[in-house]
A protein has these predicted regions:
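Metal-dependent catalytic cores of enzymes that make or break cyclic nucleotides
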Residues: 1-191
Length: 191
């Protein structure tokens, strides 16, 4: 699976902005440790379409909008918001779906404070390949992981390997900034 420079740039922007539609969802829902109610799940499932809507007038991100909208479509058609099936889902959205799911499984979340190991998360991706995830994308992701674990480099010969650096999502950046910008209950509010 070879992607060009333009596709990689689109994927990078979509990766940063894919959860932008969560911006209006209350923290009590976003950070809820228990299972979401039906109403809360419906609200959460609207975030891809809301993200696309927020960016509708940003012409520079026209190519990324479908990736943001479709990053929760399941390969078998049971995802959201449009219930697309297989190849109907843009390839870059299928890649984003795998990356987003892997990150979610390997990070601490309110509903899962103990994250899965990368190996356990990859097993989940494999288990749901052909159901939730594009099997070819999962396979390519596995090859990338295996190559990195073995120390193989896909960089130019003679160049030092560039380490993979996790890039925070827009939501993570906004949350971090909000924590630092808002007064806490122990700090007096500025007049």
């Amino acid at each position: 699976m070879i992607l060009g420079e333009t596709e990689l740039e689109q994927l990078e922007w979509a990766g940063l902005l894919h959860d932008l539609g969560k911006i209006g969802i209350r923290d009590s829902v976003l950070l809820k440790p228990e299972k979401l109610t039906r109403e809360e799940r419906i609200l959460m499932n609207e975030h891809p379409a809301k993200g696309e809507e927020i960016l509708k007038d940003v012409d520079q991100l026209a190519a990324e909008r479908p990736l943001i909208r479709h990053h929760h479509e399941w390969y078998n058609g049971s995802g959201y918001p449009d219930r697309l099936i297989g190849e109907e889902i843009p390839l870059l959205a299928r890649i984003l779906h795998v990356a987003d799911a892997f990150e979610a499984m390997t990070a601490s979340r309110p509903y899962r404070p103990i994250p899965l190991t990368p190996a356990e998360a990859y097993e989940e991706l494999e288990r749901y390949a052909g159901i939730q995830f594009d099997p070819q994308v999962v396979e390519a992701f596995g090859r990338t992981r295996t190559a990195k674990q073995a120390g193989e480099s896909h960089d130019e010969p003679g160049e030092p390997e560039q380490p993979l650096t996790p890039v925070p999502t827009l939501g993570q950046v906004a949350a971090a900034r909000a924590k630092n910008a808002l007064p806490t209950s122990s700090a007096p509010a500025e007049p």
